Amino acid sequence: MKQAMTPEEIKEKKPYLDWSLSEHEYDYICDHLLHRLPNYTEIGLFSAMWSEHCSYKKSKPVLKLFPTKGKRVVQGPGEGAGVVDIDDGQAVVFKAESHNHPTTVEPYQGAATGVGGILRDVFSMGARPVAILDSLHFGELKDNPTMRYKMEETIKGVGDYGNCMGIPNLGGETTFDPCYNGNILLNAMNVGIMDIKDMEHGDATGVGNAVMYVGAKTGRDGIHGATFASADFSEEHATQRSAVQVGDPFMEKLLMEACLELILHHREWLVGIQDMGAAGIVSSSAEMATEGKSGMDLNLNLVPQREPNMSAYEIMLSESQERMLLCVKKGHEEDVKKIFDEYNLDAVTIGRITDDGRYVLHHDDQVVCDIPVVTLTEKVLEEKSEEKKPQRIIDVEQSENWQPEIEDAGQTLRALLNQPTIANDQFVTQQYDSQVRTDTIVGPGSDSGILRVRHTKKAIAMTTDTNGRFVYLDPKVGGQRTVLESATNIVASGALPLAITDCLNYGDPNDPEIFWELHQSCQGIADACEILETPVVSGNVSLYNENNGKAIYPSPMIGMVGLIKNYDHVIPMHMQTAGDKIYLVGKTDDDFAGSELQKMMTGKISGLPHAPNLPGIKDYLYKLQKLMAEGLVQSAHDLSEGGLGVSLAESVFDTDLGVNVKLDFNKNLLFSETPGRLIVSVAPENAAKFEQEMGDAVSEIGQVTDDKQLNISLTNDQVNEDVAKLQKIWKECIPCLMKSKA
């Protein structure tokens, strides 16, 4: 690396502007925090730690809206992952993270390292990762070979990393929209299980205790990855692959086993542990010291390096993967080293804990950093962003909502099943191992993935849900509906919703309209979480998701987990037995704004999606879950994209069954996307009790048949379709698009 600038040259040439640090922030650091000019290494550390990706300096006021406490919450936001009590001294540990910019630039490695990073967040808590989910959002595939390539590589990256780790992928979601053409989204969620007594924290305390670096060696990959994720994205970034990390899942597997052995069997040696994620060593070390109200003194020459002549700046800001930082009690360094030696991993003491609150770095016999550690973590200048309601929303509030003109309901259903967001995503999920570890009860393709908790009768349900169209049209309502969609998916599987994690994917927060979208949608998420009793226990913020000034739809992703106390009561999504009665749960209205139907018929979205009656929906959803636990429900499937028509078809795919349904509404409403609805099937002998308990929240609409036909009678149309032909359309959509020559 060329000779670093002097502090005076930094002041004059302002290289920090390229690292997402403003001139105002630089002056504040000089005048109010350090009372001197920072050197090259120090300003690099400030740039990374004060980036939006690490500090949440713009989004923090909005994040304070979220409810984070609940009777089952053991650990909320602030640690590696959220921890939620699932009874019997056990907890589910989970978190979601975005890796959008790296995946857009280098799809395979961006996706793979996105999975790797979220695994480390979970096992650093003392939990064994048991499941991966992913929320993938691509541009249109048709006439877009670049997007098809990016999709293939992204899926391969997710699959290869998870498969090599031996952790099942239970699905998630895959959507397609032109707004993601220049900036795809990769949100990965990891779920782990642990005994609550084994929970670890990211603390660094105790003067003289060792700071130990464990795992893979440090290289030059990923330098300034945090600031890369905190700036506008443009065509220039298409070649910025040095900011993308390179993953090694086999190394991660060894690291996971070594860390879990240390935590579970020798925790008396350990004070704290944290993943080296965004901003690498500086982030993990500074955060651990701050959490422990301590100082830290590190010798960077002791850091294991895989490349020669690395500068202090490069060592500290590298985001090389498969690395952890430990705080180990003095005198147990060799004990810890022996564990990692058994796994062929580096384990090196690179520094000590101090009590002066200073963050001191040595390199090549020079002190290259000596600053108060809190200046990196707690003295960040929070930025108050301007907000402005977009004119498009003001205009639409004064206009009538779009209503479809459907000629043939059957033809419309066939066309919807051929939309890639609705179509079968087996092209994606078949590349994942969903059965490894042999605990999977329900894998990809259902409303929720479900995994049994070993040595118990319990099961954990999990889902990821995003709908940027609704949030774009009405951010607050869209936020509510996204959380509700997750809760409906969890209940459809027979589980009680417990808590959520999130990935908040938005454009440039310096745009007042985009910040307004962020604020309003987070308010909607908070409102829904409060009412549904699903606190936010972890998550992340990913801003600047734009390409050449064009932002994605505001796309908050909700990852939710639920508890099934007896896995004998897991509810399948497919109809089970001919003769069972079919019920529609929830009321249907003409809700087409942002729907798949609207996009398909008009090529655009418009209008205002309807606000859900959250208290009323919560009442019947949770009542339904209790009846499921009592064995009164045979199957259940939520209604989302494509509405009732699509869900009825999906409920008999891969079966020898059909449905005969009579509806008291018109053909338009067959494809309405009113939220909070499900279709359930109930055995005739349980129907009376089911109806009595559910009351007017349900209406009987038909029965399951054995003729493999989808028969739907409407007030102004009739659908008579062969299930096998519908399924063929649904299954072939994405493979056909991927094989396209255009």
Curated annotation (Swiss-Prot):
Mg(2+) 2 binds at residues 121, 275. It is an enzyme of class 6 (ligase). Pfam families: AIRS (PF00586), AIRS_C (PF02769), FGAR-AT_linker (PF18072). Mg(2+) 1 binds at residues 97, 540. One of its GO terms (molecular function) is ATP binding. Substrate binds at residues 98-101, 120, 245, 319-321, 542. ATP binds at residues 56, 95, 502, 539. The active site is at residues 53, 99. GO terms for cellular component: cytoplasm. Its EC number is 6.3.5.3. Coiled coil: none annotated. It is found in: Cytoplasm. Keywords: ATP-binding, Cytoplasm, Ligase, Magnesium, Metal-binding, Nucleotide-binding, Purine biosynthesis. Pathway: Purine metabolism; IMP biosynthesis via de novo pathway; 5-amino-1-(5-phospho-D-ribosyl)imidazole from N(2)-formyl-N(1)-(5-phospho-D-ribosyl)glycinamide: step 1/2. GO terms for biological process: 'de novo' IMP biosynthetic process. It comes from the Bacteria. It catalyses: N(2)-formyl-N(1)-(5-phospho-beta-D-ribosyl)glycinamide + L-glutamine + ATP + H2O = 2-formamido-N(1)-(5-O-phospho-beta-D-ribosyl)acetamidine + L-glutamate + ADP + phosphate + H(+). Part of the phosphoribosylformylglycinamidine synthase complex involved in the purines biosynthetic pathway. Catalyzes the ATP-dependent conversion of formylglycinamide ribonucleotide (FGAR) and glutamine to yield formylglycinamidine ribonucleotide (FGAM) and glutamate. The FGAM synthase complex is composed of three subunits. PurQ produces an ammonia molecule by converting glutamine to glutamate. PurL transfers the ammonia molecule to FGAR to form FGAM in an ATP-dependent manner. Belongs to the FGAMS family. Monomer. Part of the FGAM synthase complex composed of 1 PurL, 1 PurQ and 2 PurS subunits. HAMAP family: PurL_2. This is Phosphoribosylformylglycinamidine synthase subunit PurL. It comes from Lactobacillus acidophilus (strain ATCC 700396 / NCK56 / N2 / NCFM). The lineage of its organism: Bacteria, Bacillati, Bacillota, Bacilli, Lactobacillales. The gene is purL.
